UniProtKB/Swiss-Prot annotation:
The lineage of its organism: Bacteria, Bacillati, Bacillota, Clostridia, Thermoanaerobacterales. It comes from Carboxydothermus hydrogenoformans (strain ATCC BAA-161 / DSM 6008 / Z-2901). One of its GO terms (biological process) is DNA-templated transcription. The gene is rpoZ. It catalyses: RNA(n) + a ribonucleoside 5'-triphosphate = RNA(n+1) + diphosphate. This is DNA-directed RNA polymerase subunit omega. Coiled coil: none annotated.
């Protein structure tokens, strides 16, 4: 199965950096044993995470950063 296009994925995040971080965190969860929200599409956790993001099965929430004093 092909990767979701970057155009589709960028509509799900406010920046490429956010997309990379969200994908990496989800891939780590899958590697740690959390089940995928999709049928078996790949053995690669990053590929699974990208498909989950592309299909709106997972989202991210930006936390407010605390200001350094």
């Amino acid at each position: 199965m092909n990767q979701p296009s970057l155009d589709i994925l960028m509509k799900k995040a406010d920046s490429r950096y956010t997309l990379v971080v969200a994908t990496a965190k989800r891939a780590r969860q899958i590697t740690a044993g959390e089940s995928s929200k999709l049928k078996h599409i790949s053995n690669k956790p990053v590929t699974i995470a990208l498909h989950e993001i592309g299909n709106d099965l997972i989202t991210y929430q930006r936390l407010k950063s605390s200001q350094n004093k």
